[in-house]
């Protein structure tokens, strides 16, 4: 009789331990799902930020090229104005 009680007690302990492990597994599985969702959100944010960065880099490049063109035009105009003033001064000095 003692052997049956011992086996029953061991079986009950094992069943309880099994339930605890199943509960822990379910909890870890849920945590994993939440972490996977968070990871997907972060990856989506990172992709959106990368796209925004690419667009801004393209705009920056275009603005730098436009600025270079405008500076060249300004320098050319200043040189032309200086040439006109030099020609006018040379004419007045004659």
UniProtKB/Swiss-Prot annotation:
It comes from the Eukaryota. InterPro entries: Autophagy-rel_prot_16_dom. GO terms for cellular component: phagophore assembly site membrane. Homodimer. Part of the ATG5-ATG12/ATG16 complex. Several units of each may be present in this complex. Stabilizes the ATG5-ATG12 conjugate which is necessary for autophagy. The ATG5-ATG12/ATG16 complex is required for efficient promotion of ATG8-conjugation to phosphatidylethanolamine and ATG8 localization to the pre-autophagosomal structure (PAS). Also recruits ATG3 to the PAS. Involved in endoplasmic reticulum-specific autophagic process and is essential for the survival of cells subjected to severe ER stress. This is Autophagy protein 16. The keyword Coiled coil applies. One of its GO terms (biological process) is autophagy. It is a peripheral membrane protein. Its main location: membrane. Belongs to the ATG16 family. Residues 2-77 form a coiled coil. It is found in: Preautophagosomal structure membrane. The keyword Membrane applies. Keywords: Autophagy, Coiled coil, Membrane, Protein transport, Transport.
């Amino acid at each position: 009789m003692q052997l049956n009680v011992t086996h029953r007690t061991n079986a009950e302990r094992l069943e309880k331990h099994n339930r605890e492990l199943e509960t822990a597994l379910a909890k870890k599985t849920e945590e994993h799902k939440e972490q996977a969702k968070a990871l997907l959100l972060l990856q989506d944010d990172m992709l959106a930020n990368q796209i925004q960065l690419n667009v801004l880099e393209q705009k920056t490049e275009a603005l730098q090229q436009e600025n270079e063109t405008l500076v060249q035009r300004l320098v050319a105009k200043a040189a032309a104005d200086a040439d006109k003033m030099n020609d006018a001064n040379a004419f007045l000095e004659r």
